[in-house]
Amino acid sequence: RLTGEVYAALVNRHPDKVGFVRHADVPGGFIVVSWQDVLATYRSLAHGHDDIRPASGQVTSWHAILSRLMKDIRPRSARQSPAPSLTASSGPAILEAAEPGDLLCTLGAPWHDANYEARVAAFKAATGLRFAILIHDLIPLLRPEYFDLGRAPHFERVIAGILPLADAILTNSKATAHDVSTWADRQKIMLGSAPRVIPIGAGFDRPTWGSLPAGLNTGEYALFVSTIEVRKNHQQAFRIWSQLLRELPRDQVPKLVFAGGWGWMVEDLRKAIEATNHLDNKLAIVSSPDDATLAALYRECRFTLYLSYYEGWGLPVSDSLSFGKICVASERTSIPEAGSRFCLYVDPDNTTAAYETVKNLISSPNMLEQLEGELRDNYTPTSWTTTADAIVQTLLPEAESMKARAEFDPSPGCALAAFRRA
C-alpha cells in the first residue's frame, strides 16, 4: 500500500515533476505509461472480503506488481509542457521521452526481476541519466531464517548488483539506513551516496470508508494487520489470547482479528488455529482486506498489535496511531521509529511480559482512555504529501545537477541527442 499512496501523492502534489514508466523489452528497458494505468494497477490489487473466514491461498504480492511502475522525477525546467505520461495511455520508449535532468527512481521493491541490475545498467549507459532507489529493508539478507529457502541468495544477487548503480539511495527509516550502510561496508560495496531517510506517511489519503465485516462489533476486537507469516509473530498473539481465555472471563476478552492473507512458514500456527476452532471463535481472519475495509477495521477496533521480529518501517503501527488507536508493538528495529512514544512496547520473544501488557490494557479501561487522550493531544500523523515532498526535495537537486552537467559537458555519456523533442 505504501507505494500506491506515494504514487498518488506525487501526482497530486507534483504533476509537472513526475511521470511513470514500466519494464519493457525496448531500447532503454522502459516505456512511458499513464498515471491512469498506474492507478488502475494499484486499484486492482485490492481484493476485499466481506465475510470473516479462515484465509487460504497465497498472499498478494503488492510490491512485486507495483514495483514494475517506476517513477521518472522531472524538474520543471526540463519540461516544455506537462508530462504526457499523466494523460496518455502507453507511450514511447524512455529513450524517446527522457531529457537531460530526468532522474529514474524506483520506489517499489524490484527484487522479483532477476534482470533488474542489467536493465538499470543498460538504461544508465544508454541515457546518461541518474538512478535512485528507495530501500524498504534488507531483511532477507540479515534474517534469512524468516524466508523460504532460496529467497536470500536471489535477493542478495539483486541488491548487490543494484546498490552500486544507485546515484541516490533513500530509506524509510534510520534502522534501514543503518542496515544498508553496514551491509554494504561488510560486502565492500561502494555506495554512490549515503542513504537518506524520508518520512513515511500514515493513514489513507484517499479515504473510502467501508463497513466492518460481519461478526465484528465496534470496540470489541483487537486488530493485527499484516500478512500472516513467521516474521510478523502472529504466534505470540495467538499464545497471548489463549492465555487470556484461560485466565479471564470470556466476555472480558476482545476478539482477536488477523487482517491479512496467509503467507509462509506458519503451518503450525494454522493447525493450532484450526484445532482450537479459531480459539472458540475468539479469533477471526479477514483475508486481504481492501482499503475501505481496512480503514473500517482500524476505526472501530479497541486497540492494535504489531509484534514483528524485524521491520524496515512498520506501516501498521503508524496507521494505527493515525486512527487514534493505541498499538501494542514490538520494541525491535525500526518499529519504535514508527510508533514514537505512543505505543506500548513489548519484547517479541517474551510472551509472558507481552501477555501482562495486553492483559493490563484489557482490564484497565481508564488506562486505555488515558493513552488515547495523550495520543489525541500530542500525535500528528505524517501525511503522504509530506512523503512525496521529501522525495522530490531530496532528488531534484540530483536531477538539477545532472542537467547542469549535461548543458556544459555534452559528452557521449550525456546522450543529449537522444532526449531532444522533435
What are these regions (language model features)?
Residues 1-422:
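Carbohydrate transferase catalytic cores enriched for Leloir-type hexosyltransferases
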